[in-house]
């Protein structure tokens, strides 16, 4: 199975080669474990995630995969249907007092890439020790996450 490793501010890979729905679900599962284990150590933070994606191919599809896994794992997700930039997710994570933010984006990488960027509760990049915790929870098998979502348009 493909070994997922985070680099600067997240994990990046070529869409449909290594950046697949199955691999995104694996990272979402690891993120959910990190959120559940660590958010309880901060009394003012919710065990919740703000999620957004850029305009690259598959952003909404990959976001849906993240939401399915997070819902299955009991982590609340705040998601804007449509494009949400990294600064928007950072601000939302901070202002809504969520433990983490996730952005489906490859930032400056070529269009064939996508990525999974983690933001911490303060809105900035996730610290290396926390990234290591997330990586330690990435399973070496696929995650079965049925669609248990209810989307509300407001």
How should these model regions be labeled?
Residues 22, 87, 128-132:
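Generic alpha-helical secondary structure signal
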Residues 32-35, 77-80, 106-107, 128-133, ...:
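Short, surface-exposed, polar/charged, turn-prone segments marking secondary-structure boundaries
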Residues 40-122:
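Ferredoxin-reductase
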